[in-house]
From Swiss-Prot:
Listed EC numbers: 6.3.5.-
UniProtKB keywords: ATP-binding, Ligase, Nucleotide-binding, Protein biosynthesis
Any one Gene Ontology BP term: glutaminyl-tRNAGln biosynthesis via transamidation
UniProt xrefs under InterPro entries: Asn/Gln-tRNA_amidoTrfase_suB/E, Asn/Gln-tRNA_Trfase_suB/E_cat, Asn/Gln_amidotransferase, Asn/Gln_tRNA_amidoTrase-B-like, GatB, GatB_C_1, GatB_Yqey_C_2, Gln-tRNA_amidoTrfase_suB_CS
Record-linked SUPFAM superfamilies: GatB/YqeY motif (SSF89095), Glutamine synthetase/guanido kinase (SSF55931)
HAMAP family in alphabetical order: GatB
Protein's job: Allows the formation of correctly charged Asn-tRNA(Asn) or Gln-tRNA(Gln) through the transamidation of misacylated Asp-tRNA(Asn) or Glu-tRNA(Gln) in organisms which lack either or both of asparaginyl-tRNA or glutaminyl-tRNA synthetases. The reaction takes place in the presence of glutamine and ATP through an activated phospho-Asp-tRNA(Asn) or phospho-Glu-tRNA(Gln).
Pfam families: GatB_N, GatB_Yqey
Protein name, per record: Aspartyl/glutamyl-tRNA(Asn/Gln) amidotransferase subunit B
Class of enzymatic activity (EC top level): ligase
Family: Belongs to the GatB/GatE family. GatB subfamily.
Gene: gatB
PROSITE patterns on file: GATB
Length: 495
């Protein structure tokens, strides 16, 4: 009797993200209190954000402008009429025992965001469009500081800082179109790029300016019905988002394979132990008892106002990437790296504006300068070499004034001290030797000094040509024109 081998079930993950973006307005969403991040506890508060009786909130119009700009950036439909609602729940960091949010009439619906997923091995870029269900405005809650634990459970006592209460948030809810931890992390990064390009948030996950909750379920591939959804919280980096999802996918598949039920719950990501743990059973929307906010009027936005705010939106990352590829001839990978931060893209473009070759400038920015920034933990705005200086350096190479090797040799000094590359080259006497007669004389001296190597070369060891090139460069301090040196050596070594 032959026993049939069980067919292994293939599963797919169904993932959606709820992203909270803290806006960088100077004052809170419904009062004039400061939004400064590192103020002493409970100093940026007033009767409005603390929910005292008899006070009335007033909408900060900068928050509305930011919401509309972000809505346009994600290709969303801007509502001409929307409203605020009270979301009722009880927690120590919520002084009013309700949060002012938006429920059934959000400011933005039906958006989308294109993401690019990079293969780590091949650097190949794959594009995918993720649907966005809605974007709405709301106020942030306060912050709990736990003694003896990183969360309420297990702490000996907790303190409440209400400075964050009333800080404006945009909540962006994706469709369940994501299928992996890598896709989810890239989606979150693309949102951060957008808010930074728009100038509405710093998108700093470590400071809580960008916070993501993951909703995830798994199901057999080909099945239409969704599995039981689990929410994951407490991820403060993009790598944590990816790792938490990858762990949770494996956990849910293992549970299903073992015949165990998946509970509708909220789980926490424990960075130290690289796992998710149960926090609480999941609440449904009905538990919040939403009803219209009686102290705020409905929000009406005219098409004229939308057009005014639209005109203030800069060229966004996806638009820049397309332009870099189609107009400048850059690879998808280089275009992606250059547009990751707005400051880097601006640095690159200003360098190219000097007339420098775009591909060469891209190579310098994404390789040598990027390595320097990473090694020294700097932003591109903190280096002394201005973008015009990089353009000048690339032009010196293109014109044959200096070699690429000389450029690399002087780059560290330019990055720390700045100044004109041309002036530095002239001062140090590093101008490339491109005169045929002068180079021939130097090559003749090198060949005459190495008769044994010459004999071996002419006996068939052609790889010794590299030795002679090196000797010429050494004798000239790296100033010999590499192309001309190779041409002259070919001629003289075979003579």
């Amino acid at each position: 009797m032959v026993t049939a081998t069980p067919v292994k079930t293939e599963y797919e993950a169904i993932i959606g993200l709820e992203t909270h973006c803290q806006l960088n307005t100077h004052s809170k969403i419904f009062c004039n209190c400061s939004t400064k991040f590192d103020s002493p506890p409970n100093t940026n508060v007033c009767p409005i954000c603390l929910g005292y009786p008899g006070v009335l909130p007033v909408l900060n119009l900068e928050v509305l402008a930011s919401a509309v700009k972000m809505g346009l950036a994600i290709n969303g439909k801007i509502a001409s009429y929307s409203k605020f609602d009270r979301k009722q729940y009880f927690y120590p960091d919520l002084p009013k025992n309700y949060q002012i949010s938006q429920y059934d009439l959000p400011i933005v619906e039906q958006g989308s965001l294109e993401i690019e997923v990079v293969d780590k091995e091949t650097k190949e870029v794959t594009r995918k469009t993720i649907g966005i269900t809605r974007l709405h405005m709301e106020e942030d809650a306060g912050k709990l500081v736990h003694a003896g634990s990183d969360r309420l459970a297990g702490s000996t006592y907790s303190l409440v800082d209400f400075n964050r209460t009333g800080v404006p948030l945009l909540e962006i809810v994706s469709e369940p179109d994501l299928r992996s931890g890598q896709e989810a992390a890239e989606y979150a990064q693309e949102l951060r790029r957008l808010v930074r390009y728009l100038g509405i948030s710093d998108g700093n996950m470590q400071e809580g300016s960008l916070r993501c909750d993951v909703n995830i379920s798994v199901r057999p591939k080909g099945q239409k019905k969704f599995g039981t959804k689990v929410e994951i919280k407490n991820m403060n980096s993009f790598s944590a988002i990816q790792k938490a999802i990858e762990y949770e996918i494996e956990r849910q598949i293992e549970a299903i394979e073992n015949g165990e039920p998946i509970r509708l719950e909220t789980r926490l990501w424990e960075e130290g132990k690289q796992r998710t743990v149960t926090m609480r059973l999941k609440e449904g929307a009905s538990d919040y008892r939403y009803f219209p906010e009686p102290d705020l009027p409905p929000i009406e936005v005219s098409q004229e106002q939308i057009e005014t705010w639209k005109a203030q939106i800069p060229e966004l990352p996806a638009q820049k990437r397309t332009r870099y590829e189609t107009e400048l001839g850059l690879s998808a990978y280089d275009a992606r790296v250059l547009t990751d931060e707005r400051e880097v893209a601006e640095y690159f473009e200003t360098a190219v504006a000097t007339g420098a070759n775009a591909k060469l400038v891209a190579n310098w920015v994404t390789q040598d300068i990027a390595a320097y920034l990473n090694n020294n933990k700097l932003n591109i705005g903190e280096i002394a070499l201005k973008s015009e200086g990089l353009g000048e350096l690339v032009n010196l190479i293109e014109e044959g004034t200096i070699s690429g090797k000389i450029a690399k040799d002087i780059l560290p000094e330019l990055l720390t001290d700045g100044g004109s590359p041309k002036t530095l080259v002239e001062k140090k006497g590093l101008i490339q030797i491109s005169d045929t007669g002068e180079l021939e004389k130097i090559i003749d001296e090198v060949i005459a000094s190495h008769p044994k190597e010459l004999e071996k070369y002419r006996s068939g060891k052609k790889n010794l040509k590299g030795f002679f090139v090196g000797q010429v460069l050494k004798k000239t301090g790296g100033r010999a024109d590499p192309k001309l040196t190779n041409q002259l050596l070919d001629k003289k070594l075979e003579a």
